[in-house]
């Protein structure tokens, strides 16, 4: 009698565990009808501070991203018609920061908000006949006249009578016939949701770092008696070659270098609030000036 009642109790406990596990798994599944997904969609908008202290609210993504997300190995990439040209115009922006928000299915995505401050004005159009190559020069981020050199100020006045701008950057493109000095470029005219972009900028400086953090080298013995826990190993033999090879990975300054992150999908373009949202991280810290270009390599697998 005691043994049978014990078996019944164990059976009830197992049933409760199975029911509880199914409830937990159903709550974790990214279903539109699940309460967790509904709560995620309700709180999916994120507040991001743009340069100057202005706050914007980034809403959740739409299903437009689903059709053009980073392709898998099981299906081919459908190249957009306006992305077939490998050399197209780009823009300059300011990294506002990263945030996490959810799509319509309750799945979280890490995104970076890039603010488009006053600027992105065409200051000069270069052609093969006059300069030997085709390029468009952009000016970005308004500033006071006295903060820029006099020759640069005259250059801006000569080409389109542009206001004083802090940054100038050239973009080599295939066709410059559509651009004129003084023209204001808009993000909606150059990028669409689902486009792949290459983002370039200056990475965060980390100062003087050792070989372990800088190059990921293996540390030394940590046991008692060892005096080289994080020291660099051998850098060369005393007899042959009797010197240190050039380019040997050693301790030194880390970061503060120009980096490019490729093939980031554009998640959102807002010309009214003047910002672009891309999936993933971009070089630099908040306030870093970055350049967005249509990706040069668009293949079957992304």
Curated annotation (Swiss-Prot):
One of its GO terms (biological process) is translation. Residues 208-239 are annotated as: Disordered. Keywords: Chloroplast, Plastid, Ribonucleoprotein, Ribosomal protein, RNA-binding, rRNA-binding, Transit peptide. Its main location: plastid. The keyword Phosphoprotein does not apply. The keyword Lyase does not apply. InterPro entries: Ribosomal_uL3 (IPR000597), Ribosomal_uL3_bac/org-type (IPR019927), Ribosomal_uL3_CS (IPR019926), Transl_B-barrel_sf (IPR009000). Disulfide bonds: none annotated. One of its GO terms (cellular component) is ribosome. One of its GO terms (molecular function) is structural constituent of ribosome. It is found in: Plastid, Chloroplast. Residues 1-36 form a transit peptide. One of the primary rRNA binding proteins, it binds directly near the 3'-end of the 23S rRNA, where it nucleates assembly of the 50S subunit. Part of the 50S ribosomal subunit. This is Large ribosomal subunit protein uL3c.
């Amino acid at each position: 009698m005691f043994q049978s009642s014990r078996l019944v109790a164990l059976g009830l406990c197992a049933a409760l565990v199975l029911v509880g596990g199914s409830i937990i798994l159903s709550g974790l599944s990214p279903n539109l009808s699940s309460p967790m997904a509904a709560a995620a969609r309700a709180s999916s908008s994120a507040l991001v501070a743009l340069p100057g202290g202005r706050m914007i609210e980034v809403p959740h993504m739409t299903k437009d991203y689903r059709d053009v997300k980073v392709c898998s190995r099981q299906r081919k990439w459908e190249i957009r018609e306006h992305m077939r040209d490998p050399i197209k115009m780009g823009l300059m922006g300011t990294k506002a920061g990263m945030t996490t928000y959810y799509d319509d299915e309750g799945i979280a995505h890490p995104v970076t908000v890039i603010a488009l401050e006053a600027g992105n004005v065409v200051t000069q159009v270069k052609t093969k006949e006059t300069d030997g190559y085709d390029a468009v020069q952009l000016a970005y981020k308004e500033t006071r006249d006295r903060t820029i050199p006099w020759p640069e100020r005259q250059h801006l006045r000569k080409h389109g009578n542009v206001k004083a701008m802090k940054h100038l950057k050239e973009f080599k493109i295939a066709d410059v016939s559509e651009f004129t000095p003084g023209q204001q470029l808009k993000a909606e005219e150059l990028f669409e949701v689902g486009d792949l972009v290459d983002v370039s900028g200056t990475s965060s400086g980390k100062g003087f770092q050792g070989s372990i953090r800088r190059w990921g080298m293996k540390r030394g013995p940590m046991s008692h008696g060892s005096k080289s826990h994080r020291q660099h190993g051998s850098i060369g033999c005393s007899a042959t070659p009797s010197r240190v090879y050039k380019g040997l990975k050693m301790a030194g300054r880390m970061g503060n270098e120009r980096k490019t992150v490729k093939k980031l999908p554009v998640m959102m373009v807002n010309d009214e609030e003047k910002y672009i949202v891309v999936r993933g991280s971009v070089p630099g810290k908040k306030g870093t000036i970055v350049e967005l270009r249509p990706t040069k390599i668009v293949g079957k697998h992304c």
